[in-house]
């Protein structure tokens, strides 16, 4: 097994020069601890590692946080800090007294904006970052370049990265992006995901919500996976899992909190009044989707009924990972109105809206971009659009609408 360098490494070291605390969140097994422990060796400051997965250590952190910090003195790496939110107030006191950059590195398996106590206690004192499973650019060793529709940037990137065909893209989709699988540490993919669900996900759901029926929860997360890249339908999910809608909503919130799924919200404003309000649901790791929906090989997934949804999930998650890895907030939306006009992704930035369509075709037709015109009604300017597809080379319909191979994202 070899360590796969993460795009976030330099960002962590850079922020550690100005922030006393860094909180890195993300799903379990996404590589947070591995990366930070590798960086600890690199910085060579004698940073101690302590995990709150250990029940004795967790008990001290919760019930006597002052003693915990006396024993585990900074610089320190505290793993799974969400188990002891009581620490945050004492970390704040230490930061205010000492002002030492890089004193506290922390990881958490709950998305930071949903974690109890962080915003109240450490506001302005902590750098908040999110780590997803590996991006395809990390896997192939490419630079961290968040996706853009800037033609010059895209042309330059397409020269640096070796093109791949559709079967290779679906091999990446099916294999997934969890470091343990990609690095070769775990050879049996099915066993890995089975253990991942029972050892980590179900346990964390139980920790957050109390009791949980494992069978019904497995039905539920499978139903979510079967509807990836679709509008979030609580009623259908509840029906499939034989639970009530209140529980379905709670479990969706928990999966989002754990970094298993993310929601893409619709773009709307006062002018575009006919847009729908329901978000779409995606997984950070398409390998988990393929496991849950029982696609036995990349070839079957590529030819199956879900191939379009899998490709869309992969593409949207890759765009999101690129921005997260650069420590930048991604402003991503989709568009759908009551007249059935739809745009898969809208990127907002610099006063412009850049529309993106995702297609499983190597020969995109210009008619695909006809819906981009709905953005003209928005107060923001229509930026350069793109069709993200299986084309082997970069191209363009015209100056304002590009053709971008998905391998280059």
Language-model features: locations:
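N-terminal pre-Walker A segment at the start of P-loop NTPase domains
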Residues: 1-13
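Hydrophobic anchor at the beta1->P-loop junction of P-loop NTPases
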Residues: 24
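Accessory nucleic acid-recognition modules appended to NTPase machines
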Residues: 182-353
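Interdomain motor-coupling "hinge/lid" segment immediately C-terminal to the ATP-binding subdomain
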Residues: 111, 116-226, 230
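Domain-level recognition of nuclease-like catalytic cores that cleave nucleotide substrates
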Residues: 391-409
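Hydrophobic positions on the alpha1 helix immediately C-terminal to the Walker A/P-loop
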Residues: 35, 39
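Conserved lysine of the Walker
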Residues: 32
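Conserved catalytic/switch belt of AAA+ P-loop NTPases
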Residues: 88-112, 119-121
């Amino acid at each position: 097994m070899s360590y796969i360098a993460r795009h976030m490494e330099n960002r962590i070291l850079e922020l550690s020069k100005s922030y006393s605390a860094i909180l890195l969140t993300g799903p379990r097994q996404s590589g947070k601890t591995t990366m930070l422990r590798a960086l600890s060796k690199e910085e060579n400051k004698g940073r101690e590692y302590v995990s709150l997965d250990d029940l004795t250590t967790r008990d001290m952190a919760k019930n006597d946080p002052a003693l915990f910090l006396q024993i585990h003195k900074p610089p320190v790496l505290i793993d799974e800090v969400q188990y002891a939110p009581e620490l945050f107030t004492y970390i704040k006191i230490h930061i205010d007294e000492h002002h030492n950059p890089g004193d506290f590195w922390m990881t958490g398996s709950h998305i930071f904006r949903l974690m109890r106590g962080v915003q109240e206690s450490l506001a302005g004192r902590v750098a908040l970052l999110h780590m997803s499973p590996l991006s395809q650019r990390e896997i192939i060793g490419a630079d961290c370049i968040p996706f853009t529709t800037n033609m010059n940037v895209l042309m330059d990137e397409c020269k640096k990265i070796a093109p791949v065909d559709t079967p290779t893209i679906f091999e990446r989709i099916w294999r997934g992006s969890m470091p343990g699988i990609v690095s070769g540490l775990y050879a049996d993919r099915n066993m890995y995901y089975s253990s991942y669900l029972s050892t980590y996900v179900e346990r964390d759901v139980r920790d957050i919500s109390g009791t949980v029926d494992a069978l019904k929860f497995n039905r539920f997360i499978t139903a979510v996976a079967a509807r990836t890249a679709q509008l979030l339908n609580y009623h259908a999910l509840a029906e499939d899992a034989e639970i009530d809608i209140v529980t379905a909503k709670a479990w969706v919130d928990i999966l989002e909190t754990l970094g298993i799924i993310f929601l893409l919200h619709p773009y709307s404003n006062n002018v575009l009044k006919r847009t729908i309000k329901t978000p779409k649901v995606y997984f950070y790791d398409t390998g988990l989707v393929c496991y849950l929906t029982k696609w036995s090989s990349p070839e079957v997934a590529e030819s199956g009924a879900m191939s379009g949804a899998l490709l869309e999930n992969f593409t949207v998650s890759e765009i999101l990972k690129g921005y997260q890895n650069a420590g930048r907030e991604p402003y991503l939306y989709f568009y759908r109105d009551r007249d059935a006009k739809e745009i898969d992704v809208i990127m907002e930035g610099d006063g412009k809206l850049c529309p993106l369509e995702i297609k499983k075709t190597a020969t995109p037709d210009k008619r695909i971009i006809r819906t981009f015109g709905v953005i003209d009604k928005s107060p923001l300017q229509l930026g350069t659009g793109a069709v993200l597809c299986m084309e082997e080379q970069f191209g363009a319909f015209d100056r304002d609408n590009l053709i971008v191979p998905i391998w280059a994202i």
